[in-house]
Amino acid sequence: MAHVVGYDSLNEASNGYIGVEDLNAPLGALQMGACPTPFQSMLLGDGVPQEVAVWKLGPKGARRSGVHQIDPAGRRAWLPGQDCIWKQHGVWEIGSNGEARLLRPDYFAVLDGQAVDFNRRYLRPFVNRFAGAIRSVEPEALIFVESVPPKALPEWGGEDAGKIVSAAHWYDGIVLTLKTFMPWLGVDVSTLRLVVGPWAVRRSFARQIRQLQQEAFQKMGGAPTLIGEFGIPFDLKEKYAYRSGD
């Protein structure tokens, strides 16, 4: 197909819990609203009520603003008679006092006594296998790679597949999260700090996009960058367009 230049390997390849060093700590820097820790998520999935932290985006980034009680009312993610899979694997247990207890906070961070690097151990080999499969049919196809913003791209070397392109995603973080356009307010996605003033916002946007290009060039053997996703939500201003037709 002459009109197809290449194929994306995996959209925003997420590590999930892989590499998380403490299952009882907040998961990542981007926290908004009620955010259970990974351990609390396991307990909620097992029907156990949890008091979870509530986060808000402030001038200096995300900050904890309160707590919220989430009660699944006994509803579980598992079939009747089946334990939580992570409980079966010894990640947590119900103690003699009837309380849940985290046994292995680093369960997803260590494998065979070694620290787990998601990009090196899983994503990079996957992309190489994907590239091999695609090029067995289309030898000249480009292969697009991206991570979950703002996480790093995988390191790429001469032994890896060639003709790789970074398909990093970029959005105006304020528009994406608050669903309203404010040209005088932005957010630096690498630090989650607010940027104030229209010129400062535009400079911040340019710097963020330049950083995406530089990271790909430095970490992926001179790979070019094609922004793989950008745009605005359709439901701005409380879905005004759906109501007005404008």
Q: Language-model features: where?
A:
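Active-site region of glycoside hydrolase catalytic domains
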Residues: 1-240
